[in-house]
Amino acid sequence: ALNPAFINIQSVAGSSAFEGEINEAKESFEKSDRVEYYRITTWKRAILRKIFDNSYDQIRHDKSLTTWIERNEWAKPYCVYCTLKQQNNEASWKDWSDYRDPDAEQVGKLWTKFRKDCLYHAWMQYVAEMQFCTAVSEVSQMGLHIKGDIPILINEDSADVWADRKYFSLADRAGAPPDMFSYAGQNWGFPTYRWDVIEKDNFSWWRKRLAQASKFYHAYRIDHVLGFFRIWTIPEKEVTGILGHFEPSVPLTWDVLHGAGFCRQSLEYLRNPNYSVDQLRGFLGDDTERLVAKCFENLPGTTDRFILRDEYSSEKQILAMEEPQAVKDAMLRVYWNRVFIPTGSDDVFYPYWYWYNQPVLYTLPQNEQDKLHDIIHANEHAQNALWEQNAMKLLSVLANETDMLVCAEDLGAVPPCVPTVLNKLNILSLRIERWARNWNMQYSPYYDMEEYPRLSVCTTSCHDTSTLRGLWKEPDFDRNLYWAHAHQMG
């Protein structure tokens, strides 16, 4: 769906009846030093509703609109969703009292029940699409091409997730693992895909998404292309990204760990540690006795070992405690202290990101610590082939579905399989000049542009950076190094 905020109101049939109101609003908006997005979008939707209501008899009998709705099967679920969302004061569908999990038949009945309001949303989409297609046609005649963006993920509170629930895992969230900029990683809040279900439907949801985009774009960028290789997956109950794992990935198994001498009890201890009061004092300090009584219970069969109560078994629950932030931080350190993250299976184990420096690891004999180091490091090297296979399957669909030129956002640290797959599928890579440097050498020299992949989009900046002029003015920017690089390139 398109954003009605970009509709040219004065070009909409029937707008002349409200010419004075439109001109007055336009003059008011143009006086502002900034684009008042919320105010403008609210006004546009309101004036579009006035135009729609005033022209309703003509609109509901418009054969072109009727045909457009029939050809775009996403339109009815989307319009029903928008109508219900308005009726529920824009609340998430998860908070609605009715219609939270509809099937196709129910969507059809709701379209009929709320036909006028649904038709209003369909009409806005039709108008927006016609205007966009006209603009693309005019630009094409000038010899220019339009490049769009295809985000890999979808907001949970969306028509797609509401209507096509089977394609999404609401028990998980996508994000990014910890790095030098974020100790706890990132939790983006978007549900992950159930790729097995999507594949059973011959990737129809993705094919339709690309077909819609191809109406407007000559080329498109795959945002976070690494997510088609593997996505950092976090349980929905968590807040940060620290307790995630890559999906898909080759897990450690009970057979491997048992073969190395680890028993069930030891592995459970490494996944869900238990503590003595003295050990907890190392985390909780002067609050130990109070917090043990409040947040912990005895390990079954013991009187002197403690585990977290179920009420404090997630980041959300810990951060919701009515305690000072310092206490919450200490409780999080207890919660994060593990070698393996919970998986819901006794036979599958994913290492915690910081497994190698956790206090629980150091309670093991040195020989067992060494075994775990060897096993986990070997497992890390086993992932590349799986990720290459997964990306080839998924990206082949995207690359071959339309005639749009495909570009990838492959910035940052990428697995070795990424350039291999992009080259095989003729998907363009991305190079941002200021970041295309050899960071392992003294002064981090810029790469010669002749070293960039032949199939790549090269630019001095992007939406995540300042402009080139802005970069030049940054106080810590090495102008001499960049100037030498620029002159070397001619």
Task: Identify what each model region corresponds to.
Residues 1-490:
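Catalytic cores of glycan-processing enzymes that make or break glycosidic bonds
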